[in-house]
């Protein structure tokens, strides 16, 4: 009898959690990235030639182009968003950036670096194509995002998710690998100077709590209590970028 009652309670909890933890839509993802892009633009030089790494559908590249930047975009052929592209995205092997040395004044990525398994080696490629006085800006999922994704995933599917990125063996140790401190150490060890840091000031998870039913304004407020879902880093390989950011 007790076992039956417990199963009934668990089914009820799962039913409720499935309602609140919805499937993520592209429209919701675009709303989040649009808000984040507003923060990014405040941290970038006002003009320049931009390379977006991991461009997905290409709509962030398009948005940057519409704001006066000269934008090129790259992504791997197996990108989940390849079928929904709205902008010209060059496919590459994920290791070698298909551009000449000193081509770009700005390198931009959003929720991309964590998916690169040879992340330290890849920094050499970013250094190579970046002009000496250029900046790199990366938006990266945070420890808070990882923690709350684990919790919401558990509530919805009754299991812990696998690691989201490439550095950690599982989603529990990934909480550390997504920390601000881990990225700061990696960037410094690979020849970068950290010019500025910020957060995206939004709360969301990989399990998509309420999707677009929880608006951006409320997600902004929740981030003050539950933590921001992404960290933002502006990097340079020379002191000359200080006066531009």
Predicted region positions:
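Conserved N-terminal segment of class I S-adenosyl-L-methionine
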Residues: 1-96, 106-108, 123, 199-202, ...
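A short SAM/SAH-binding and catalytic strip from SAM-dependent methyltransferases
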Residues: 106-117
């Amino acid at each position: 009898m007790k076992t039956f009652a417990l199963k009934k309670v668990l089914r009820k909890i799962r039913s409720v959690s499935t309602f609140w933890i919805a499937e993520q839509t592209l429209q919701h993802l675009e709303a989040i990235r649009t808000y984040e892009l507003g923060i990014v633009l405040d941290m970038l030089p006002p003009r320049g030639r931009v390379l977006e790494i991991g461009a997905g559908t290409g709509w962030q590249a398009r948005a940057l182009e519409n704001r006066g930047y000269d934008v090129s975009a790259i992504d791997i052929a197996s990108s989940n968003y390849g079928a929904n592209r709205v902008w010209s995205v060059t496919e590459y092997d994920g290791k070698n950036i298909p551009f000449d040395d000193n081509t770009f004044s700005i390198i931009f990525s959003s929720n991309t670096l964590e998916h690169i398994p040879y992340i330290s080696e890849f920094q050499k490629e970013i250094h190579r194509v970046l002009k000496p006085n250029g900046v790199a800006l990366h938006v990266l999922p945070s420890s808070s995002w990882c923690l709350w994704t684990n919790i919401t995933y558990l509530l919805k599917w009754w299991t812990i998710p696998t690691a989201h990125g490439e550095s950690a063996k599982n989603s529990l140790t990934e909480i550390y690998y997504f920390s601000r401190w881990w990225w700061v150490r990696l960037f410094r060890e690979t020849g970068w100077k950290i010019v500025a840091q910020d957060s995206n000031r939004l709360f969301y998870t990989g399990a998509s709590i309420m999707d677009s039913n929880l608006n951006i304004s409320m997600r902004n407020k929740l981030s003050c209590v539950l933590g921001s879902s992404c960290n933002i880093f502006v990097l340079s390989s020379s002191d000359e970028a200080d006066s531009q950011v």
